[in-house]
């Protein structure tokens, strides 16, 4: 399966700082979207990505991306089965902050992966382009940072 998972990609202190930045960035955002609580986007024709990049850990610059989506999931929230837009590149990177999460790949057989605080998940190939993925309801507050590139 073309998936790479790094469970402790960020330190506990980096997670705490970044979760605080996520909360600050979402203050005033009221839009609820598709099972998530709040969403904010940078890059492409969204908000200025470079403005926020100055505040996130240097190691994020190692990820090849030109767009970033910040998702907030309060307890019980999730994102339903979907395939990310084909307008994005072949590989997607997800950093998980806060409570644990279970990502589900709706393949045969179904694959589940637990995502911990500070973990980095990347997936590509058929998992990216033809197999739907979702998350199970969050047991507590969680943020995800989704890094993508244009095709």
Regions from the language model: what does each represent?
Residues 1-151:
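Non-heme Fe(II) oxygenase metal-center motifs and adjacent flexible, charged/small-residue loops
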């Amino acid at each position: 399966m073309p998936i790479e998972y790094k469970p402790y990609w960020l330190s506990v202190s980096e997670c705490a700082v970044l979760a605080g930045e996520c909360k600050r960035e979402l203050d005033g955002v009221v839009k609820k979207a598709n099972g998530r609580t709040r969403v904010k986007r940078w890059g492409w024709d969204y908000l200025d990505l470079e403005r926020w990049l100055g505040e996130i850990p240097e190691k994020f610059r190692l990820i090849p991306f030109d767009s970033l989506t910040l998702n907030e999931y309060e307890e019980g929230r999730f994102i339903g089965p979907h395939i990310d837009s084909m307008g994005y590149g072949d590989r997607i990177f997800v950093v998980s902050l806060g409570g644990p999460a279970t990502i589900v790949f709706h393949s045969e057989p179904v694959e589940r992966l637990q995502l911990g605080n500070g973990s980095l998940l990347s997936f590509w190939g058929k998992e990216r382009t033809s197999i739907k993925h979702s998350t199970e309801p969050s047991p507590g507050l969680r943020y995800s940072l989704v890094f993508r590139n244009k095709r």
